[in-house]
A protein has these predicted regions:
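Surface-exposed, short loops/turns at beta-strand junctions within beta-sandwich domains
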Residues: 529-531
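Intrinsically disordered, low-complexity polar segments enriched in Ser/Thr/Pro and acidic
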Residues: 303, 372, 435, 508, ...
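Extracellular, repeat-based ectodomains that mediate carbohydrate processing or recognition
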Residues: 22-500
Length: 549
């Protein structure tokens, strides 16, 4: 296939995107990629799901951000217009400024449906790892009257911070698998693990495969290995602090976990059943799992408690497989009232405490709740936790869960960050972010941001210096598109990183002797080659000059 780097549709939208977006300086988030565009007649339109959907974000060790999203448009295949789902990638520097003048188009194959899952993570060298599933195996053989490919073949890409496709323009691909719509990836050291599920709907079967890929794009195994041979098994994998993998799944006996090395060899004599229940719900990622900083993991999940009733179960699994919360875990809401959903979890290795956030709907009241545990399984709040925020349905427009959790994070000194969405009426929401002291006896600060919005696909990331939100704004009049937000852990919007102030083009450090010259436009965005007019060129020694082409 002749790969086109950017589509005309994307260019039309990109022209309307912010020219020099950066992190917000107040409580108003920034649109990094707008779905507002101008057509050939000069009329302005707002694109919906087709123009930008399913955003994902991942942070690098040098405080940059990779953003990915998908679009659904058309492409020409042998003179015939076909449907195509594309994945795009953008890198933000630590100031939040896009580093590519236009987003990089990762894949461009005819695909009828976007009913698939892709993934984004960061390699040890700061490159982006992106997985996709598309119609590459079928595109060349489609019938003339076929709108798009009806198959999904998996592929994985590695793209460095210069925009280079390190594993080739088509990545590491497996076109022999044609029903692998769901893909995922994670990184352990210099190894990347690629996971995809290949389904056979004729006999309702599915096999989950895994491949380990070396830093240079070669594979550790001749063929992908079978990870799971069960269509309905729910699983997740967490890399440990010491380079192993914790593999979470379940059986009829309950939720279980096994420790694996990088060759997928079990490190415990048998899997550990850590709860006699397992997940009950409809989310893609069933369990909320975070490392405990000691080689183990903390997990929270939603489980059935009867018809239309749920509770949140919590467990701490030590590095040796022993269970700190007993054989059956602990309930976040330890009382016989069961309508609790959507957990989030954070762990603080410094204080050895766990915070679980969840949404509750009891007696007509929607609330965001929190429960706190020690690593040893002691409740630090009352049995039913503490209410972070709540409202009656009558005051929330009658919408279920007027208060919806977003996430939690740990601050090194023992404080906690809590974020939630306040739904006033349909398509009218806001985010509230709070910092509490360690025992929730004091609100250190509260910020309500992004009022009157309609966000979807929200990702929250907490780091030592700041909390980040990434989402897709869908509301017309609110600059719809891929949106970013940052706030420091001190409640201020001016964030200083531990390793010094932000470095811009005008003050680049002179410690890059083996770096090739790089070209930027006047907005500070990196471009692959000089544009006609004035450009900024950064030399190998770090000096910057303006050059006219």
């Amino acid at each position: 296939m002749k790969k086109k780097l950017y589509s005309l549709l994307l260019l039309a939208i990109a022209m309307a995107a912010p020219a020099h977006a950066q992190w917000n300086t107040n409580g108003t988030p920034k649109c990094i990629f707008s779905t507002t565009y101008v057509d050939e007649n000069g009329e302005t339109h707002v694109g919906g799901d087709y123009y930008a959907c399913s955003p994902k974000a991942a942070r690098t060790a040098d405080k940059k951000t990779w953003l990915a999203w998908r679009t659904w448009g058309r492409k020409d295949v042998n003179g015939i217009s076909r449907s195509a789902v594309r994945t795009y990638l953008q890198l933000l520097d630590r100031d939040g400024v896009p580093q590519f003048a236009e987003p990089i188009m990762v894949n461009d194959y005819a695909t009828t449906s976007w009913w698939s899952e892709y993934a984004l993570c960061v390699a040890s060298d700061g490159s982006a790892i992106v997985t996709v599933a598309d119609g590459r195996a079928e595109e060349a053989s489609m019938a003339d009257d076929q709108d798009g490919a009806s198959t999904f073949s998996p592929a994985i890409y590695k793209i460095d911070q210069e925009g280079n496709f390190l594993w080739g323009l088509d990545g590491v691909e497996y076109p022999q698998f044609t029903n692998a719509a769901f893909t995922n990836a994670f990184v352990v050291g210099d190894d990347t693990f690629f996971i995809f599920v290949n389904s056979d709907y004729t006999d309702e079967s599915a096999v989950t495969y895994i491949q380990r890929i070396n830093d240079d794009g070669t594979t550790a195994w001749d063929e992908p290995r079978v990870l799971i041979n069960d269509m309905f098994l729910q699983y997740q994998i967490l890399p440990t602090d010491d380079g192993d993998l914790l593999f979470f799944d379940h059986t009829a006996d309950g939720a279980r976990v096994q420790r694996l090395n990088r060759d997928l060899e079990p490190q415990w004599s048998e899997p550990v059943i850590y709860d006699d229940h397992y997940y009950g719900g409809y989310e893609m990622n069933h369990y909320r799992i975070v490392p405990d900083g000691m080689g183990g993991a903390c997990v929270a999940f939603q489980r059935f408690m009867g018809e239309f009733s749920h509770n949140i179960r919590v467990q701490h699994i030590n590095a040796d497989g022993s269970l700190a919360f007993g054989l059956t875990g602990l309930d976040a809401y330890n009382a016989e009232e069961y309508d609790h959903n959507y957990p989030a979890i954070a762990a603080n290795p410094e204080t050895q405490e766990i915070l679980v956030q969840f949404a509750s709907q009891l007696a007509g009241k929607g609330a965001v709740m929190a429960q706190r545990f020690t690593y040893d399984g002691d409740y630090l709040f009352d049995d039913t936790g503490v209410e972070v925020a709540g409202k009656n349905d009558a005051t929330s427009g009658g919408y279920y869960f007027g208060m919806v959790k977003t996430g939690v994070g740990a601050v090194k000194n023992g404080d906690w960050l809590v974020a939630y969405r306040d739904i006033t009426t349909y398509s009218k929401e806001s985010f509230t972010i709070r910092r509490y002291n360690s025992d929730f006896s004091e609100r250190v600060w509260t910020r309500t941001i992004a009022r009157d919005i309609a966000p979807t696909d929200v990702t929250m990331i907490c780091e030592d210096e700041a909390l980040y939100l990434f989402y897709r704004e869908t509301k017309t009049g609110k600059n719809p598109g891929i949106t970013i937000f940052r706030i420091g852990i001190d409640g201020n919007y001016d964030v200083t990183y531990d390793d010094g102030p932000t470095v811009g083009i005008e003050n680049v450090e002179r410690s890059t002797l083996n770096v090739q010259p790089a070209t930027f436009n006047l907005q500070g965005q990196r471009i692959s080659k000089p544009a006609f007019g004035l450009n900024i060129v950064r030399q190998a020694d770090g000096t910057t000059t303006k050059q006219l082409r």
